[in-house]
């Protein structure tokens, strides 16, 4: 007898967009049921069922096996769970007596004990079609009413019945549906006398179809919150690029996942007086700025409880006040610090990089792919024009991230205003290679193993550009050598460095230490 699990995760959810891969405590939502099912040791394999290769690739990162993409007719919101499961039973050629477990991609509250209890119950009751989970309604449906045409009781006969006298009713918890393959093949109804329902506490159950319920489920998976004022200040000038904002948004997200309140402030002025007025003695400050001077950092540290600075290059001793925490997640950052001081606490290297899991996926090798991603940040229009001019006759399609679209651009160019992370990840995945500045996008190109040419556009980018090149991850180029370098760019995976380079594994510990939690 075989036992398999299938995680259903279609990409067209309507109430919460992309709910199955929404970030949930530093993992895509669908990672939770996959990991729990694998850790239970009950199943031969855990499969991902989806209509999206993006979802499939994310799921594979967490150990799921790949089924063929679902047919469109089974990927819309009219397709039922039983229809999808019946399709997969035939696809996997399961025997009637085999066991299949259906899980939903958004089942973040699933636990191993739920699966083991269901598996044991099904095996003990051979005539049972399914075992699923349920939970009592928090308020009795017998006392429910509608508001159409005034207040209308749904069960008028119980309008005066004491609540303690009302029969307990249950709802489907949606965590799992475990059954015989034959029952799924024949699409036997789940809610019938041939099924067994396992009762769960309401604290173990949450439907996240609505955003409010998503927030509730976050509270359930993390039972307490420690709240404190955390303020993040980052450069947001026309000439500062987009990297400061992007990495601070990710830091903010990590902090919130620790149950801590945080706010992001965009630094667009020549002084910090307005921001400084809002800083209190209990505040934890994080800054990511090239525009602040040494005096500014002393003023901030004097008013705040603690200060962390994000930087890309070492500053002289005394530039920051004593007890400042210094975060630099440049590749091999420690190698470039020559005057380490006991006055500061350092967090150096890619282990502290804030990883976005949406950029981690297996990249297929496709030498026929003619799509090229170009991303230089938000301010390098002159260089961008030169790159387009060099490549416009190379028989490729250029996908350019830029806040500006020129008049009458070449036919092989496609311009995109700054994209959100999910959109950027999808575009990156669709391209065979990239030409990028040496800013924060380097790390996402590395995570996605996108063959790339690197063109530093600022002095602070040179160090990390050289480090990535020294490891054979990317090649540094220039406008003079771009045409030749592009011709020689190999569309292949480079697994050697990928196996030894770990991004982001130390960040949570550093933030916990900084925030004293």
Swiss-Prot record:
Keywords: Hydrolase, Magnesium, Metal-binding, Multifunctional enzyme, Nucleotidyltransferase, Transferase. Pfam families: CTP_transf_3. Residues 209-517 are annotated as: UDP-2,4-diacetamido-2,4,6-trideoxy-beta-L-altropyranose hydrolase. It comes from the Bacteria. It catalyses: UDP-2,4-diacetamido-2,4,6-trideoxy-beta-L-altrose + H2O = 2,4-diacetamido-2,4,6-trideoxy-beta-L-altrose + UDP + H(+); pseudaminate + CTP = CMP-pseudaminate + diphosphate. Mg(2+) is required for pseudaminic acid cytidylyltransferase activity. The active site is at 244 (proton acceptor). InterPro entries: CMP-NeuNAc_synthase (IPR050793), Cytidylyl_trans (IPR003329), Nucleotide-diphossugar_trans (IPR029044), PseF (IPR020039). GO terms for molecular function: hydrolase activity; metal ion binding; N-acylneuraminate cytidylyltransferase activity. Its EC number is 2.7.7.81, 3.6.1.57. Its cofactor is Mg(2+). SUPFAM superfamilies: Nucleotide-diphospho-sugar transferases, UDP-Glycosyltransferase/glycogen phosphorylase. Residues 1-208 are annotated as: Pseudaminic acid cytidylyltransferase. Monomer. In the N-terminal section; belongs to the CMP-NeuNAc synthase family. In the C-terminal section; belongs to the PseG family. In publications, PseF (HP_0326A) and PseG (HP_0326B) are separated into 2 separate ORFs. However, these 2 enzymes are fused into a single protein in strain ATCC 700392 / 26695. Catalyzes the fourth and sixth steps in the biosynthesis of pseudaminic acid, a sialic-acid-like sugar that is used to modify flagellin. The N-terminal part mediates the last step of the pathway by mediating activation of pseudaminic acid with CMP by forming CMP-pseudaminic acid. This is Pseudaminic acid cytidylyltransferase and UDP-2,4-diacetamido-2,4,6-trideoxy-beta-L-altropyranose hydrolase. It comes from Helicobacter pylori (strain ATCC 700392 / 26695) (Campylobacter pylori).
